[in-house]
């Protein structure tokens, strides 16, 4: 009616959601999309007998993580898959990483994702990941830095080790701002750089961060290849509704890497304790299958291999995932979606803007009958090419978790 406020799509979806006993499983193969090397992408080069067996029973298509031509970070691309508009809900990597390793944060705290990196004598970053140092070495360096630098200009600083070269840095004090540029060139072969405040109010915070970077690099001179630090994703805890509030779901997450656990926790998922292997993640899914109605299962190895430019390694990771597929299907979820959060072609050694293939299984799909789970096969599916933001809607619909819209 005239004069009435028009509901947004998000509000409509929330009004249609109902709670049922159907089980939804979203399998995210991180960075699964690729580009051809000698005529084949990583998915096309992989030997995947189980994908080939199950794919004909699915409906398929291609999804754009954020929008046409935009290369997404892992945060925005996952948010979209979970049903959150990444342009509306912006969550910094620092907060995601911090929550993923159970670091307590207040609304005043500023968190950043950190890398130990290798700096040459000319101030050039020659390896952003310091050769992927062992996690044990990471813990040793973090303990050293934590004792060496406890505060800068009255701001308390805590460092927390992650996996391999990764860590989380938390600044605690009043008036800290998160509108800062990344202190990370994002590519090897470029000069190390500090952060800049994007507002007048953020300049003081930028000064504190840059002083920390200088002191940390001086302290790490004898720790080659981990002789400097890079920081990005400066962020504070945002306001965001939970998946339970939005979709009437009881969601749980199974992921081995902190960032993904942190993002899942932010949207209200229960974080399930799991092991480090794909097999252990699937065993966790089995163990808790009766307790929740939505499961997010994350597999990381494909993305790591892609970022390393390791085409064969990514193919091997895809084949490893293929081997555990029957165990997931054996659980008989009412809806199963298999896709990626973004593409990470080994030829680019980074995330890219290319769409990801998706398979959707339920009792209510019209199977496409495709022979393989690849970019080329999925582009001909009846789902077509659509935004990742709509994946959760399709899953809810196929799980009979949405009421009819309108009269």
Task: Place the predicted regions along the sequence by residue.
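Feature captures the catalytic ectodomains and active-site-proximal regions of enzymes
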Residues: 2-407
């Amino acid at each position: 009616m005239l004069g009435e406020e028009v509901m947004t799509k998000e509000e409509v979806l929330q009004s249609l959601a109902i709670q049922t006993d159907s089980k939804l499983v979203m399998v995210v193969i991180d960075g699964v999309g690729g580009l051809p090397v000698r005529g084949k992408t990583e998915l096309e080069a992989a030997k995947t007998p189980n994908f080939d067996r199950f794919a004909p029973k699915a409906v398929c298509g291609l999804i754009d993580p954020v929008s046409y031509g935009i290369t997404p970070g892992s945060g925005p691309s996952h948010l979209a898959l979970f049903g959150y508009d990444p342009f509306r809900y912006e969550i910094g990597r620092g907060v995601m990483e911090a929550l993923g390793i159970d670091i307590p944060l207040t609304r005043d705290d500023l968190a950043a994702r950190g890398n130990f990196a290798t700096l040459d004598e000319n101030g050039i970053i020659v390896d952003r990941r310091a050769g992927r140092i062992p996690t044990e070495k990471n813990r040793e360096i973090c303990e050293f830095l934590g004792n060496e630098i406890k505060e800068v200009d009255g701001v308390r600083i805590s460092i927390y080790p992650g996996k391999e070269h990764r860590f989380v840095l938390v600044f605690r004090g009043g008036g800290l701002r998160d509108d800062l540029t990344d202190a990370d060139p994002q590519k090897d072969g470029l000069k190390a750089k500090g952060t800049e405040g994007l507002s007048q109010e953020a300049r003081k915070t930028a000064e504190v961060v840059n002083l920390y970077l200088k002191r940390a690099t001086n302290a790490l001179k004898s720790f080659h290849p981990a002789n400097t630090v890079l920081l990005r994703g400066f962020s504070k805890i945002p306001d965001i509704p939970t998946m339970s509030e939005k979709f009437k779901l009881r969601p749980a997450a199974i992921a081995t890497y902190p960032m993904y656990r942190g993002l899942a926790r932010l949207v209200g998922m229960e974080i399930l304790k799991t092991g480090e292997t794909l097999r252990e993640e699937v065993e966790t899914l089995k163990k808790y299958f009766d307790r929740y109605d939505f499961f997010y299962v994350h597999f990381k190895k494909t993305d790591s291999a892609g970022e390393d430019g390791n085409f064969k390694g990514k193919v091997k990771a895809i084949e490893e995932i293929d081997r555990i597929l029957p165990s997931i299907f054996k659980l008989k979820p009412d809806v199963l979606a298999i896709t990626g959060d973004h593409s990470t072609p080994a030829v680019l050694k980074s995330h890219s803007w290319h769409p990801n293939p998706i398979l959707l299984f339920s009792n209510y799909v019209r199977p496409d009958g495709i022979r393989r789970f690849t970019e080329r096969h999925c582009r001909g599916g009846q789902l077509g090419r659509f935004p990742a933001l709509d994946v959760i809607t399709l899953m809810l619909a196929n799980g009979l978790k949405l009421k009819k819209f309108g009269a």
